[in-house]
A protein has these predicted regions:
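Alpha/beta enzyme core
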Residues: 1-127
Length: 127
């Protein structure tokens, strides 16, 4: 895997996602598209959901994966990796980097962004 610092300075990261209801949303299809992207020059992929992250990690074990989990909650407009459960799910599935909503909006369980980041650093050893 390419060191994260190098990735952030150069290269192409391809977002490999499909909307709900799409026949392309199948984890095997997502993994195949991610592999094709990596074989053709992408240095990493951005994936949505633990299921897709896990499928790509199994198929492309050396891939740089930026993971997120889109979730809707009735009491919050935060959508991208909104809380601890989602952070933990993305990380456990095999993401190297966790993408999350970095706004100060109210999160589903009232968690603060700073607290979530601190917890991820401590419990997941995410830097």
């Amino acid at each position: 895997m390419i060191p994260i610092a190098e990735v952030l300075n150069k290269g192409l990261i391809v977002s490999v996602q499909a909307p709900l209801g799409s026949p392309m949303r199948d984890p095997d299809v997502i993994a195949a598209m991610a592999e094709a992207s990596l074989r053709n020059g992408a240095i990493g992929v951005r994936l949505e959901s633990p299921e897709h992250i896990g499928a790509v990690r199994r198929r492309c074990p050396e891939a740089l994966i930026i993971g997120l989990w889109k979730c809707t909650f009735p009491n919050s407009s935060v959508y991208i990796t909104p809380g601890w459960r989602e952070i933990q799910g993305v990380w456990s599935a095999g993401a190297d980097v966790i993408a999350l909503d970095a706004t100060e909006r109210i999160r589903p369980e009232g968690q603060l962004l700073a607290d979530l980041i601190q917890r991820a650093r401590q419990e997941l050893r995410a830097t």
